[in-house]
Amino acid sequence: MYKRQLFYWSFFVIVVVIDIFYKRYQMNQEENEKELEKDVAIALEDRKKLMIDAVTAISQMLDAKDGYTQQHSKRVAEYSLMIAKSMNKFSDKDYKIIYRSALLHDIGKIAVPDMILNKPGRLTDEEYNIMRKHTVWGGEILKDLEFLPDADKGAIYHHERIDGKGYPYGIKADELPELVRIISAADSLDAMSSNRCYRKQCDKQYIIDEFKKGAGRQFDNEVAHIVISLIEKGELLSEA
């Protein structure tokens, strides 16, 4: 009887000890997993930061390549962000995607010869056809960027129109993502408000009139009216 009790108590103690060690093992494993998850999160954040730095560097390099549109990409990104925030329908994550995609909307111009990109005058038909290809080239460059979904669409479609009369594919409103509609308007806004080799910048009233005429045709109706409102309130083109 005594031996049996001793056996049971010994067995109980062993089980308790094993349980304690197992729980400690689990705790250590959980701590290790948390540390590993933390390390992975830090590594992913570092990778994302490197990607963002690369995006910024590429946009700056692109602006430097095009002598007539210095800081164009940055302005388009800033205008796009202002328009998006005025729409009150996007998340903070969406704002980042819109801003960074806008920074790269003209990345395909890297493949356009400098003699065409910086020509001091209007382009010939042949040169214009080459210039138009920057949209497709940009899409090819950006299509595999996982951290910037739809950035390729911003590059490909930012010269498309709501009425289907744009390029490169002539697609219409229902096929154009909101990101594209925003970037397209911001790109046109900067084009009109900047000095070009063949013309001076347009005044505010002219730009407002162009967005009024283009609403529902060239531009998304909602986006066009937001741009007009921001200009009239002095939140856009305040220095123009």
Enumerate the language-model features and the residues they cover.
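Conserved small/polar residues in nucleotide/adenosyl-binding loops
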Residues: 1-5
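Juxtamembrane or sensor-core-proximal signal-transducing alpha helices
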Residues: 7-42
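Signal-transmission coiled-coils
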Residues: 33, 37-44, 51, 61-66
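Short, flexible segments with low predicted structural confidence
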Residues: 11-12, 19, 47-48, 102-103, ...
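Metal-dependent catalytic cores of enzymes that make or break cyclic nucleotides
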Residues: 52, 56-240
